[in-house]
């Protein structure tokens, strides 16, 4: 924001599913997330935030080719979004300490996060690039976009 780069908040719309129904308590953003009037909010309907959403058209409109990706559900929403963005040839920086998940039946959340950070560091992208960096490494970066994925996928 300090450099006037656009910020996009992605919010899961689970209308009709019984979870994360639009305008319900579980749909609301966390109080810690500060949404400014200049920020963009885009509804998502699946783990992949590009699926049937306005995200691709908004990124095209803003002439964005570089993405910072953060969010909830590392192993669902964040992973699906990264895979989808790579097939669209975006240059991606995953914020290493900017995504989270819950405990899973066979893995603690910490191990899930550690595993996906490793996967993304060792991935062979299409025409874009993918990096995993700690927030401290990128806070002064001059990239053109930040994606904040606040949606829940599972």
Predicted regions and their residues:
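Active-site-adjacent betaalpha module
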Residues: 2-3, 19-154
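Short beta-strand segments at enzyme active-site cores
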Residues: 6-12
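Acidic carboxylate-rich catalytic motifs and surrounding loops in phosphoryl-/glycosyl-chemistry enzymes
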Residues: 12-13, 46
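Short, active-site-adjacent cap segments at secondary-structure transitions
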Residues: 15-17
């Amino acid at each position: 924001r300090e450099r006037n780069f656009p910020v996009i908040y992605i919010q899961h719309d689970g209308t009709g599913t019984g979870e994360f129904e639009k305008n319900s308590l579980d749909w609301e953003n966390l109080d810690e997330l500060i949404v400014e009037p200049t920020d963009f909010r885009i509804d998502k309907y699946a783990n992949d935030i590009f699926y049937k959403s306005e995200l691709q058209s908004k990124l095209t409109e803003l002439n964005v080719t570089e993405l910072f990706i953060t969010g909830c559900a590392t192993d669902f929403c964040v992973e699906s979004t990264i895979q989808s963005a790579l097939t669209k040839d975006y240059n991606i920086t995953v914020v290493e300490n900017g995504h989270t998940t819950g405990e899973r039946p066979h893995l603690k959340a910490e191990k899930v996060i550690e595993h996906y950070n490793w996967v993304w560091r060792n991935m062979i992208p299409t025409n874009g690039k993918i990096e995993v960096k700690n927030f401290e490494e990128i806070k002064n970066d001059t990239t053109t976009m930040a994606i904040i994925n606040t949606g829940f996928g599972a």
